[in-house]
Amino acid sequence: MSDAAYFTEMEAKIPTGKVRTRFAPSPTGYMHIGNLRTALYTWLIARSHGGTFILRIEDTDQGRLVEGATDVIYRTMAECHLNHDEGPDIGGPVAPYIQSQRRDTYGKYARLLAEKGGAYYCFCEKCASEEDTGDFDRADDPCRDLLLEDALRRVEAGEPYVIRQRIPKEGTTTFHDAVFGDITVENSTLDDQVLLKRDGLPTYNFANVIDDHLMGITHVVRGSEYLSSAPKYDLLYHAFGWEVPTYVHCSPVMRDAQNKMSKRHGDPSYEDLKAEGYLTDAILNYVALLGWSPKGELAEQEIFSLDALVKAFDLTGISKSPAIFDKAKLDHFNAVYLRAMSPEDFAKAAEPYIRQSVKGDFDVAAIAALLQARCERLTDIPEKVDFFDACPEYDVEFFTNKKSKTNPEVCKAMLEAAIPMLAALPRWTDEAIHDGLIALAEQLGVKNATLMWPVRIAAAGKLVTPGGAVEICRILGRGETLRRLRAGLEKLA
């Protein structure tokens, strides 16, 4: 097939008529929060417009690839319910969706651009690293002014080369971004970036333009760090005579006011957050609000399901200002989602964490019921329930509590009265234990808390517990409860 026929065929394949977005990660490690936000916004744009969401793997930088990272991408997208309509695993009308499998395409389009005058062959030794280092001075490059036929003769002779973008020496380039508006730059400030490296692989900046065009991408979402490259992308589109997609540049997610989030500095990836006990839905909800806010009647709303986000999402809500990742705020979101779960679903999610500390034959569902309103992260659970298996050593001062009007002497009297009452209960249920303790407090002429405090301390050995004396005693069982209360009484003797 001739190159002309090839280009005609490629253009004919381009889908048209609806919004098409793409998430195009590089398989270089875990899904960091900025990447997850890009995936989410890209997915939301497609879904809110009834469009198509594409997953593309950008693996042209072979030196940075990490084994297994592509599987992490698939797994994360599936867990987050960001289902794609086209991609490497399911195919589609503009396959392949892995850049390393499109190598010939980039070479053909780079050569086409050189024929159009928008690029040139560069044979300089300074290109030997195969990558433009950023200090390239096009004014000093004799290759820029080579006649195309002379350059092609050198290529035919086997001379190593790169293909560089031919940036106009004068004038300005203006591009439009959906977030930042119109931006104009002086062409003299732009470098003749490498498009095709000596090994025949494209640079990121070239491959993404070619792929976005050939895949019919209408909206390109990326970080604001790429704003400086956008005028060069714009010039590439115009040099080919192609329509420019809508750019959506998102400001960075920051660790604090001065520093961007970075895996190198220990900032969490999506998988890290999952391992720390955060729910996927809570993570997505929080990440959606890192740089975007709803408008109108939803302006004060914080909690959004994915379906609700699809209905609410609008590009006008994306902020130019950086967003600061606040773990305390994420804790709040996670707590809301934990409390909204059905008791059955929460118990299922909590059980592995409960079992990290509780090995005995206890009612896991009952323990989970105590926890649901009292934890912000699933990983909080083991420490909260470790007393069920074995009562920890505790200080006798735990029995002193000003609000409950207790001290060691008072608690000794309370336990001396509570032990025989609990031993004599005909049934060991929450209701029976509760009613028995309340009646005993009335009989002793003390506040309920004055009796409940020492019973809970002796039963759990901790100042702070999920649930109170009644629930803890019921789950421990009569025999273990009485054993622990007697041990507490011995401490007070």
Describe every region a protein language model picked out.
Residues 1-30, 48-53, 160, 170, ...:
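Non-catalytic terminal extensions that flank enzyme cores
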Residues 2-134, 229-242, 282:
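N-terminal Rossmann-like or analogous alpha/beta NTP/dinucleotide-binding catalytic cores
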Residues 42, 73, 113, 117, ...:
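Residue-level signal for inorganic ion chemistry
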Residues 47-61, 206-219, 240-254, 467-469, ...:
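Glycine-rich phosphate/pyrophosphate-binding loops
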Residues 119-249, 255-261, 269, 426:
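Active-site cores that bind ATP or allylic diphosphates and position pyrophosphate for catalysis
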Residues 286-287, 334, 368-375, 451-459, ...:
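Short alpha-helical scaffolding segments that buttress acidic/His motifs in well-ordered protein cores
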Residues 343-444:
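Small-residue-rich helix-loop
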Residues 431-492:
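Charged substrate- and nucleic-acid-binding regions of tRNA-handling and nucleotidyl-transfer enzymes
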